[in-house]
Amino acid sequence: MERRTRQKRAIEAVLEKHKNPLTAPEILRLALKEIPTLGIATVYRFLKSLTKDGRVVSVEIPGQMPRYERADKGHHHHFLCRACGGVFELERCLAGIKTMAPPRFRVEDHEIILYGSCETCLRKEKRASQPLVA
């Protein structure tokens, strides 16, 4: 039986609290508030264990380091903001996506990533483009 140390509880709390998938360095930064001595190696080891046990899944986005989120969230997709690099959950899935496969093919899984700008970055962009009033 695996010991539930303070470090592990802090990592689990970060994953529980944050809706969006996080990189290991992001998890470390957030967990350091609770455990100042926590190291990145511990974070990676525990994420590997959680992934192996099926409690956490890795979110793979091309050109980025893996992100991690709880496995109990069910099937969903992600949105990558090209301006800030943030990754956000999409709550819905395309209806009928499995019917897009060619005849006599079987879809076993799929993953969709939308790319663009998040609400915060769009607001910043809009403010930056507004002329200064003299």
Where are these regions (language model features)?
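Short alpha-helical segments that sit at the start of domains
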Residues: 1-13
